[in-house]
Amino acid sequence: MSTIPGMLTAFLLIVCEPGAIGRLGRALADTEGVAEVYTTTGSADFIAVVRVADLDALATTVTQHIAELPGIVRTDTHLAIRSYGRGDEAAAFDIGVD
């Protein structure tokens, strides 16, 4: 996965209350800064990919928008520091001119 220059990418592992997955999926996806949301197997119920401009925006997104959603039990944030793959973001901005 590639990152967008000038943006921070973080991966949030999210644990929710039993029975909350159905309603939290859409709420997480609709949260500003959240680019993708997946339900998962394992210790986390969701993994959310967050892309924001800076650490202040990340802190606001995680602590004020995501962690405060009813049904969220715990979040664990992992900040991406380097990308090794080719992602769709570069192709999205390609206008086809060499």
For each predicted feature, which ranges?
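A compositional/biophysical signature of low hydrophobicity enriched in polar/charged and small residues
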Residues: M1-D98
